[in-house]
Each structure stands twice: as C-alpha cells, then as structure tokens.
Amino acid sequence: MASARRWARKAERCCCTFATYFPLAFVYGLTSWAVWVVVNIGSVSTKSSWIGTGSSIVGVALYVMLNWCYTTAVFTPPGSTTNDMGYGLLPTQNTPQATSFTVKSNGEFRFCKKCQARKPDRAHHCSTCRRCVLKMDHHCPWLATCIGLRNHKAFLLFLIYTSLFCFWSFAVSACWVWYEALNDQEYIDSFLPVNFIMLSVISGIIGLVVGAFTSWHIHLARCGQTTIECLEKTRYLSPLRKTYNSAHNPANEVPEAARHFVDFHANALPGITRPEEGEERREMPRSYPPDGSQPVQLSYAQREREQRQRRYEEYLDEQDSEKLPNVFDLGWKRNLLHLFGPTPALWFFPVSNTTGDGWTWEASSTWLEARDRLSAEREQQRAREVNAGWGSPDDIPDIPERPTGAGKHYSPSPNLAGPKTMSKADRVLGRDPNLYADATQDVPMQRLSPRGRSIDDELADLDTDDEDGFLDANNPDKAEGGKFSPSFTSDSHRRDDAEARALEVVTNGNWGRGGASGMLRKGSSQSTPTRTPSNLSRSGTPKFQDEGVD
C-alpha cells in the first residue's frame, strides 16, 4: 500500500513537471523550425526580389530577440512579497510607507492569509506559484510562471517580437507559395514546399491570434492597467477615509519577536509591519469618545441600526468606486516609461529596468480630484440627511473592539455597568430584562453545616445550652435570673461539639459519623438479651445463650 502511494506521488510529480516544461519545449521547437524554413526559403532562388539573404537575416534577428525575451520572461522572478522560503522580505534600508488605494470587496484592507503578509496595491496571490506577486498581470501557462513587476517588460517584448516574427514568416512563405508553387510545376513532386506551405498557414494563424493579444497588452500598458485590473472590478478606498492610512490595525500586527527583529535593524517593512489587505475578516479601528470612556455594549435595536447604516455606507462606497477613474493611470508617456524604463537605449531589449518597487504607487491627479469631489458630495448628502431627520450627525456608534491574537477566541466579559442585553427568548417573547430583573442572591462565603446553618450559629447555640445546663446543675438560685459566663470551656472543645450537633440531621439524634451503618449497630445492640449476673463468667465477660439454628 505504501509502495503504491509512493509511485502515485512520483507519477503526479512527473505529470506536473511535464506540464510545466512542455510549453517551453513547444515554443523553442516551433520557433526553431520556423526560422529554419525562413532561411531555406531565402536560400532558394525565387522570382521575388526581396526574398533572399536579407530576409533570412531579418528572420534570424527576430528569432534571437524572440527567444531572448522569452527566456528572460520565464526565468526572471516576477517579484513577490515573500522570498523563496516563504519569509517576508526585509529591506536593507528604510523604505517609504506603502500606499493603499485599493481594498477588498468588503471595504477592508488587503492581506493574504496564505502568505501571512500584506498585499500592496496591484498585488495578488497566485495559487499555481503559491505566492503573492507584485503588480500581477496574470499567470501565463506558455511561460509556466506569473507575469509581474520584474518580467512584465520581457513578456510584452516577447509578444511584440513573436508577432513580428510570425508576420515576417508569413510574408516570406506566402510570397514564395504565390510566385513559385502556384505558377510553376517544378515543385509538385518535392517535399520541400510542404514546409513552406505549412509555415505560411501556421504563421498566419498564430500571427493573427498573438497580434491581437499583443495589441491588447500594449493598450493596457498605455493606460497603466494590468489584465486583472481590466477584467475584474477594482474596489477603491472609500472617499471618506484617509488614503494614506498610517494607523496600525491590531489584527495585522506581526509577532513580538518579528517586531523586535525589525526594530533592531531600524527597518520598517511595508506590508509586513504595516496594515493591508486580508482574505480573512479584519475590522477597521474604531475611535473612542473624546472623554476616554469605553463604549457600552449595544442593544439589539442599536445593533440593527448600525448594520443598516453600515450596509448603506457600503452601497455608497460601491457606487463611488465605480465613478472613480483608474488611480494608476499617469498618462500614456509616464505609463510606458514606468514599464520600459527611463533609458531609451534599453527599451527594445529584455533588461529589467522597470521603475518602482511594487509597494508604493503614485496616484493619478484625475483620480485625486474625483475622490475629493465625491467626498464633498458625500458630506453634503449626509448633512442633508441629518437636516431632514433621516440620520444622526454622529457616525456609526462605537462598539468595543474584539481581542486579537490568541485572545480572540475567548468570550468578552460582560459589562455590568451598562444595560442588560436582551436574550433571544426575551426578543421573541417581547420581554424587557430590565423590568423583570430578579434580586441578587449572593451567598456569603461562610463555612456551612450540612443542614444549611453556619458553624458560628451552631457555636452560639451550643454556648447557650452549656450555660443553661451549668446554671441548673451548680447554682439553682442563679438559674432563674442570674447571669453566668463559663470561661473554662475551650474553643476547640466547643467547635467539636458544634460539629457533632450539626451532624444530627434527624430528630432521633442517632445520626453520627457512622452514618446509616452506625444507627443499625446501635439498634442491634438495643435488641440483644438482657445481661444478668448468671450470664457473666468468672472473668467478667458476658455469656450469651446460643439458641441454635431452627
């Protein structure tokens, strides 16, 4: 069984390896065959004047640039929030604070619970690569890797050179087929024109598909967008919130040891030591009243009101997010300079000189103006609602923050100072717990006897009985109205007597430490025959008459 499972895992790894490297072998093999056909067409005499050595040189140059860009795009890491071992990247110098223009679909900051690291703007988690990729465009199966910040330029150049190579191969092969194969019967019985015809068909089809794909990616690069940002709806931070959120969310704090390690090196790691996005729910920090008092626990009506207000705010945020333009569109010139680098001599070569670190992004001036305008409109709308009596001038009522870390699994302690929260039964039956509150039934911390009386009460009764008995026996004259206090009784003796009296829970007084078995022994001793002097032996021991067995 174990051997079969081991072979199954090996087969799975082999299949995954084949699926990973097959696209690479296919691209290298197909392009090599195409350039070989182009060179052969140039070496064959044709009626076309431009097909020859020059066409072969251009084809080889495009082939070299194509494979150079392809190799660079495949083997260049796209950039991630963590390293190869899964640890958060620690910079060697102080970096500026990361910006947060985008949020999750529920309006919260972006955080990856799989990588346990903050996801900056334009970063996404790839399930195939199992890491978060900075400025992720998409995961390309033909490259067997993700297209991100560091290899996006090489990928776009690969598409451009592939399209040019396909169009050039199609032009060379199609011209040869048009001038030679269709007008001359010399090549009918030869196998060489088959490759020429296949190249014209394959290069034409691939050129149309890859050319359209290349045009679309050039348009995205010109607009400052990625494939994910174009196909998916981007949720921006609410206009009423501060764009550069410098406050630390307790839910996003790093462990104590990691924070000490970062502080020791005097580095502030964006995304690890500062808040961001999360697939898990992370509450926004709430402010407390100016007087510093803690908010009381909300009632059911207040909680319903808060939920309605929150849903309404989320609806307005969704509408405002759709009205905002692309925050990363800085103009087509600056967008292309960001992708291809500031050096014009390196624009046509797959050298990674893309500007930026993937953590901080500059916002578009158009987006900032639109955000400020929407913020002013929201404030005016809220003021109109308050004046019309539809809302409260205050924000959503504050509720106590839930504990984070290991303490988030414990139930919060009840707030005794605030009003009582209605239970589910009270809400269903329409009862108010404040009207039918029972009196407190606090039990004092005293030592109680088995019949519910305290030991002090038993001692007081015992003292009274001992005092009365002593007066009756020794001083009958003072027993009627005199006062006497026995001072010779020790406290330990009185406590033992009180404990013995406390154990007498039945009225016959026969219940003692022996319990039920002790009472049975006493009853059996009372039912034994009466001892007479004749029944005593000389040694003084009693003699019992054996009645025998019936």
Swiss-Prot record:
Classification via PROSITE patterns: DHHC (PS50216)
Region of interest: Disordered: 272-304, 378-422, 434-550
Segments forming domain DHHC: 110-160
Topological category with respect to the lipid bilayer: Multi-pass membrane protein
Subcellular localization, as worded in the UniProt entry: Vacuole membrane
Enzyme class: transferase
InterPro entries according to UniProt: Palmitoyltrfase_DHHC, PFA4/ZDH16/20/ERF2-like
Keywords, comma-separated and alphabetical: Acyltransferase, Lipoprotein, Membrane, Palmitate, Transferase, Transmembrane, Transmembrane helix, Vacuole
Compositionally biased spans, kind Basic and acidic residues: 274-285, 491-502
GO cellular component, one term: vacuolar membrane
Sequence ranges of Polar residues compositional bias: 523-542
Pfam families: DHHC (PF01529)
Documented EC number(s): 2.3.1.225
Segments passing through the bilayer: 22-42, 57-77, 154-174, 191-211
Main location group: membrane
Organism domain of life: Eukaryota
Recorded domain comment: The DHHC domain is required for palmitoyltransferase activity.
PANTHER family: PALMITOYLTRANSFERASE ZDHHC16
Annotated family: Belongs to the DHHC palmitoyltransferase family. PFA3 subfamily.
Protein's UniProt name: Palmitoyltransferase PFA3
Species of provenance: Gibberella zeae (strain ATCC MYA-4620 / CBS 123657 / FGSC 9075 / NRRL 31084 / PH-1)
Gene: PFA3
